[in-house]
């Protein structure tokens, strides 16, 4: 029986010829001329039970395993750490009114040190003001902070661990919040 025919029989696509015995390339390990009379008289038991599967039968239910839970989350879990200002030390808000883009470093250093910054861009031309807002947006993204537009060309930059109270935000909008540093 050829390889293709054996594969078809194995997959159930063809029936095996019972009267055809393929003994090509078969070596039973006995020496030539060895006479084993018992092997010649005892039939070899073969299980040739073939069962047709009925499409109407219910599938056999496999035992279910409990769902596997990962040891750690699959991805980063965003968490915002907020220190309530009233319960900790009072924070200071720095107000900076840059006149050119060259003063961006001072804004970045104050914010990086954990100080909320009011960035007042009213004295800047629109091109430099836009560049400074872009800088602040990158700063906020990189240090996981928050930015709010207070009024036209005035922004509040809050570090990730500081929450500016609504009272202070209202004072900033009204223009009565001055540099507390």
Swiss-Prot record:
Residues 18-27 have a biased composition (Acidic residues). One of its GO terms (biological process) is division septum assembly. Residues 18-42 are annotated as: Disordered. Pfam families: SepF. It is found in: Cytoplasm. Cell division protein that is part of the divisome complex and is recruited early to the Z-ring. Probably stimulates Z-ring formation, perhaps through the cross-linking of FtsZ protofilaments. Its function overlaps with FtsA. Belongs to the SepF family. This is Cell division protein SepF. The gene is sepF.
